Every structure is written in C-alpha cells, then in structure tokens.
Amino acid sequence: MLEEALRLSRIKRFAPSSEQSGQTSLFDEAETESTIALEATADEAALDSDAPTDDDLDADAAELDVIEPASPKQKPGRKPFASNLPREQIFITLSDEEKAGAISTFFTKAKEELDIIPAKVRILEYMQEKAVFLDTHQAEQKRRIIAATLPKHPVPGAMGSIELMVYVLVCKYCDGLPLYRQESILARYGGELGRATLANWIIALARPLQALVNLIRDHQLAGDIIMADETRIQVLKEPGRPATSDKFMWVTLGGPPGQPSVLFEYDPSRSKDVPMRLIEGFSGYLQTDGYAGYNAVCITNHITQVGCWDHTRRKFKEAQDAQPKPKKGKPHRASKADHLLSLINTLYMIERQIKPLSAAEKFQQRCQRSRPILNKIKAYVDDNRQKVPKEGLTGLAMTYLVNQWDKLTIYCTNGELNISNILAENAIRPFVIGRKAWLFSDTPKGARASAIHYSLIETAKANGLEPYTYLIHVLKALPNADTVEQIEALLPWNLKK
C-alpha cells in the first residue's frame, strides 16, 4: 500500500493531469463507438470470467436498440465569421491609367479579415442644460432655474462610466485579469486609476445587483434539478479566521427549462448549514459529489440525492495509475481496477451515444443498456471486495462505490438527470481559473461581491448572452427599476427572447 501511494504521488506530481484511462475496455461491447480505440489485448479481454463472448455480444445487439456511431467529423477548416459582427468595406480601386478605355468597372469581394479596435480611454463630459425663468409674483420678479435630468448611475459620485466599470468586471471575472494588471493597462492608455478604486467599484456594483441575484435564486429553486459543488478560496481578513485557512465558494446550477442559472455564494464554512441555506425551499433532485454535508440537507428537505460517477471513476483511475508497470517483455495482466474502469467507461460511452435523445428516450436506453452494466459492476465489487486490501486504493475505491451505490444509480430513473456532476464542476471552473491569477480576496465583502458578479456573468453565458453587453444594459436600467416586475425584466432569459 505504501508503494502504491508513492507511485500515485509521483504520477500526480510529474504526469499529465488527464483522467483518460490507459485501459479503456476489456470487452468489445456491441454498442462501442467506432471512435473509441480499444488497446486491451485479447489476453486482457479474456482475463475475467464475466467478460462476454462474441456470441453473447451478438445476442445483446439483437435485443438492444443500438444507436449508430456519429458520422465522422468534418475536416478542420476556416470557420466563417459571425454574421452579427459589424462590417466595414474597404474599396481598392484601379488608377485612372489602369482603367482608361474600360467599358465598365465593378467590385468583387476579394477577402475578409477580422479586425479589432484596441481599448481607448476618453473623458465623458456631461454638459447639463439649464433654463432660467423669470416668475412674477406680487410685482416681484424671481429667477427660477430648471436643469435637464442627469442619467442615474449605479454608483453615485463615481468617477468611472458604467462601461468602464463593466469592463473591469468582465476583465477580472471572465478573463481572469487581476486588478493590478488592469491598473497598469489603464495607465498605459492614459487613465490613472489605482487598484483600490477599481476594487471599491466592484464592491459598490454588487449592492444593486444583489436584487437580481435574489430573483435568480428564486427561479433556480423552482426547478426540478440542482447541481452543487464547492471550492476553496483564501480570504485574508475573515474575522476570527487565520488568513491562510480555507474558506469556500459554493456554486449551484439549475433552474426550470429554458431558464438556466449558475449561482455562486461565499461562506467561510463548509458545514451542512451552507447548503441547507442555499437550497431552502427546494424539492427535487440534488446532484453532488460524495461530500457528506449534503446528506443531512437531502434528508431534512426530502430531496432525492444523485451521485456523481466522475468521482467514483477518478478513484479507480488513481488505483489503476498506482499499479506497478509490467516488466519488459511480459504481458500486462488486467487488474480489478482495470476491469471496473472498463465497465464504468461503458456507462459513459452509452451516455455519449444517447446525448441527442429526449428525456423519455434516454430513460428507456438507460433501462435497456446501462442497468445491465450497473448490475455487472455491483456483482463484481461484491465478489471481489474482500479479495483486495481494505486500505489499498482499489479497496478504498470499492468502499466508496458501495457507500454511494444508491445515489450512483438514481440517474437511471429519470432521463433528465446526468451521470455525473460535471456541469457543476464546469460552472465553477471560471472561478478556479481566475483564482490562479488573482490568488485571494482581501475581505469577506470583496469575496461576496465576487460571488455576485460571477453569478450574473455565468448565468448570462448560460443563456447565450454576451456578459459585457448584458451587464451594461442591466446597470443602466437598474437605477430606474422601482418594481419587482421591472427587475424581473432584466433576468437573462427575459432578455434573450
């Protein structure tokens, strides 16, 4: 077990961080996609008595409604430019000498080039018109002045335009550009602004946007499925906590059909109280990793908890990676981790094939095709669990699978569910990538502001909206929104219609 741990540690440190298993499949399943290359040898395929024969596979193919592999991908080539981009025509003309004597001339499009206009700093001077009136009252004349109403700003008194503030938000939360680098970029263009000013803008903008995030949360809780995940964040000035201690950014993904939402929430704790608060009032399916903090939430709120096969697969992949390499000239003997990984990979292969289908069709296919594979996995683990060291990586992976089994098989009962929590992990990835650049938040207030901005940006992206354009529209409209209906109109799915 110590050797196993050392090999895994060495692989994690030096090897590429891909989770693709070297051992893909021990069987030539009839459903296997043509694009999946099987590297297992015939000896490995025959190693386990449970491996189906060719006759078995032919019978399976006759019984199951097998989906044909997707057509081969087209060869890569130049993609056409988006039709919604503005276009400017540049006319290349002949000289008078060259076209002398021609009966006519005409233009043809010779080529297209993608162009960019670099950022440019300017000063907007608001010239407010005022009118002077002379009012006569009891033989006395008094001057009265009225002024044109200035547009409302979400941060009154700020020296930056809404466009500049949104530019700062998008650069940090979409592009992972820390404020100190934005400070130097603005200075290069002639705009002298300190990073403290930029940080204050980020916190100030979060206040009016909180109302919008609250409404998005209400819509998310009205859906049938929520996916949840959490990741670490360092907040330096969290009261009562060391600067180096772990705090957490939580993400929930869900919403009714046509109203996808991604919500972030900062909390210094990883206790069950946080998800309890985030999904209060929700009833449906909650898909998570194996973190025990979600268990009490689901029991208390009568929520069906869905497991994540990604985490299960990852544990068997670690067990596979930690195996000793076969000596030169000797055949590789497939291990129990290899066998289980092959079965798990078959589950994923089925999911890729049925991806275009409706929820009802997915449910049917899972019953016909995934259920038998799940039964094989469970039977194999039950038969072999006592044959491996309990504290070894394969033993730990088997224990995890057994403990999570009911949650891992729930996805086969509803075609709307996913085999893994990968969508929540993908939703939190922009935060993880950004964290590598800006490293930490200084204060809890800043971390909460970041959660609000990530929520709106990622929800806008999930609804097909460009974040910069969307946030400018929202921040110009919010100061004039006096009712819930007016704020509702600014939700991303209402603007994409």
Q: Can you name each region flagged by the protein language model?
A:
Residues M1-M159, M227-A228, G254, R366:
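Short, flexible loop/hinge motifs at secondary-structure junctions
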Residues A45, Q74, P80, E88, ...:
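Catalytic center-proximal scaffold of phosphoryl-transfer enzymes
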